């Protein structure tokens, strides 16, 4: 089956042609603004000028006639509206002219599926990093789920914005990578990981301040990469444990960065996960990836009429069924993204020793700082939670030099393992989170892997929590929990309804927090 795919969500218009056996052609034309970032109307004008040319060239390279095409696929979203409209119009015109079926493709889905095809990955956790997108994605329950993403700007846009202020033209990423190789001094930048999500606006603000103060651009570039990439790899590792996968795949324009590739590969070696890299020729937006996703969708029985092909600039990957994926499920025992757990004895009491292990992918200086800060913070948050009557482990010993905590054992099952069989437990979770929040305590990583269900609801691994939390911090807790539940259960809305009823009943400011949760979702410009 020969599929023609058209990509045009942002700065690139591209046509790819492939079948089940080979990629026959992939032709692209990229809009490069003379100054500043992407101007949507100018990008669309570029696509209008080039779309016929790239289609004709791709057909020529493929050595086929237009009538040989069996299916037309195009990027339906997410992306810039003007660019999407040009692409969809061209695809519809082609499909109608050739009297062939048409199918609209989710842009991130294309990145995943071309990466899998070229690398041999079967069921990976994907780190999708580009100008507008920063997401950690895995297939669970019939769909790809977004396990973590940016809460503000995409990492590629952050790098490009810094580059513009530093006088580097678009795209700035490759030049920042070159400059970073000559950097020697690690400047302190915000390390903003919130559960499974990240935030890069603080890094940009601090980096620009360093630029104004006259710090060498090489050192700033070096510090941006080391800090931002460490955040990404940390969340990626956490996603492996949450999803039960043992493969990692990288895609998107930022995935071309050799330092990021090196860090992801090192993390994979540390946790015994297989790391796959999308061929660099296909990391950037391209038509072949749209053709590949369209091929899989069509062969799985998915069909669209012309009237179903309206563009969707906010089209999320978790809205798309992906029945062709065969899921894996790996059990990681006594391990997490932050630490290793060892059963021990503390003066006759059953205990666990939580060892915050060094991360080889992080610079030693940064790693020492992060591990030390988080262990100290976990000790503080646990103590405050116990004072508030919340079930948490007892801290028997705190060793800041060895970076270990010795804690009491909590018997029970993880929420992720019981949530389907015992959905009514969510009311109890809502009650205890309300108590936590009423005492101005946030957990910081409130996922289904950090809640234990026994005769009580108990919380573990609060190393990213706060003891004088703002409403925004409390909202991130609820947002993180909701996302982790939705990623694992098709009944997420029902489960969260039980949670929210109890949360509202036991926390006077619950509605304020839940309104901020919705605001966080609206702030997700990059989907």
Curated annotation (Swiss-Prot):
Cell compartments where the protein resides: Cytoplasm
Amino-acid positions noted as binding L-threonylcarbamoyladenylate in the UniProt annotation, renumbered to this chain: 128-132, 160, 173, 177, 257
Gene3D superfamilies for the chain: 3.30.420.40, Phosphorylase Kinase, domain 1, Transferase(Phosphotransferase) domain 1
Residues spanning the signal sequence: none
A single GO cellular-component term on record: EKC/KEOPS complex
Cofactor: Fe(2+)
PROSITE patterns membership: GLYCOPROTEASE (PS01016), PROTEIN_KINASE_TYR (PS00109)
GO biological processes: tRNA threonylcarbamoyladenosine modification
Boundaries of every Protein kinase domain copy: 330-527
Keyword Ion transport recorded: no
HAMAP family (alphabetical): Kae1, Kae1_Bud32_arch
NCBIfam families in alphabetical order: arch_bud32, arch_KAE1, gcp_kae1, PRK09605.1
Entry protein name: Probable bifunctional tRNA threonylcarbamoyladenosine biosynthesis protein
Source organism per UniProt: Thermoplasma volcanium (strain ATCC 51530 / DSM 4299 / JCM 9571 / NBRC 15438 / GSS1)
């Amino acid at each position: 089956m020969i599929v023609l795919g058209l990509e045009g969500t942002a700065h690139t218009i591209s046509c790819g042609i492939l079948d089940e056996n080979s990629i026959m052609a992939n032709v692209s034309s990229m809009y490069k603004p003379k100054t500043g970032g992407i101007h949507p109307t100018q990008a669309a004008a570029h696509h209008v000028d080039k779309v016929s040319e790239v289609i004709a060239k791709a057909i020529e390279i493929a050595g086929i006639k237009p009538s040989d095409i069996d299916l037309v696929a195009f990027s339906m979203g997410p992306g810039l509206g003007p660019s999407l409209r040009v692409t969809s119009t061209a695809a519809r015109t082609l499909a109608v002219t050739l009297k062939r079926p048409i199918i609209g493709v989710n842009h991130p889905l294309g990145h995943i599926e071309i990466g899998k095809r070229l690398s041999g990955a079967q069921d990976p956790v994907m780190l999708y990093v580009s100008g507008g997108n920063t997401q950690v994605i895995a297939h669970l329950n019939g769909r790809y789920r977004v396990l973590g993403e940016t809460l503000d700007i995409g990492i590629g846009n952050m790098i490009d914005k810094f580059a513009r202020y530093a006088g580097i033209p678009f795209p700035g990423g490759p030049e920042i990578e070159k400059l970073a190789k000559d950097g020697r001094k690690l400047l302190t930048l915000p390390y903003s990981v919130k559960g499974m999500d990240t935030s890069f606006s603080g890094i940009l603000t601090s980096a620009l301040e360093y630029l104004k103060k006259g710090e060498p651009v090489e050192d700033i570039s070096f510090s941006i990469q080391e800090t931002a990439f460490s955040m990404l790899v940390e969340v990626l590792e956490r996603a492996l444990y949450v999803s039960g996968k043992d493969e990692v795949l990288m895609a998107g324009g930022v995935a071309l960065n050799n330092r990021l590739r090196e860090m992801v590969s090192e993390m994979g070696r540390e946790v015994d996960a297989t790391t796959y890299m999308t061929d660099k020729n296909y990391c950037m937006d391209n038509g072949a990836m749209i053709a590949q996703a369209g091929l899989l969708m069509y062969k799985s029985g998915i069909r669209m009429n012309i009237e179903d092909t309206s563009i969707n600039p906010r089209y999320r990957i978790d809205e798309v069924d992906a029945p062709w994926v065969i899921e894996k499920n790996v059990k990681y025992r006594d391990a997490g993204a932050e630490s290793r757990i060892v059963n021990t004895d503390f003066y006759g009491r059953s205990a666990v020793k939580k060892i915050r292990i060094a991360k080889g992918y992080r610079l030693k200086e940064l790693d020492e700082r992060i591990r030390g800060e988080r262990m100290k913070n976990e000790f503080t948050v646990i103590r405050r939670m116990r004072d508030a009557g919340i079930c948490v482990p007892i801290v028997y010993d705190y060793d800041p030099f060895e970076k270990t905590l010795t804690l009491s054992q909590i018997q029970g099952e993880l929420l992720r393992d019981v949530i389907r069989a015992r959905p009514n437990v969510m009311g109890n979770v809502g009650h205890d989170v309300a108590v936590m929040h009423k005492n101005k305590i946030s957990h910081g990583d409130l996922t289904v892997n950090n809640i234990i269900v026994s005769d009580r609801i108990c919380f573990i691994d609060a190393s990213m929590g706060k003891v004088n939390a703002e409403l925004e911090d409390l909202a991130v807790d609820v947002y993180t929990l909701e996302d982790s539940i939705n990623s694992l259960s098709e009944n997420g809305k029902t489960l969260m309804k039980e949670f929210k009823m109890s949360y509202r009943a036991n926390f006077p400011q619950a509605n304020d927090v839940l309104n901020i949760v919705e605001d966080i979702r609206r702030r997700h410009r990059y989907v």
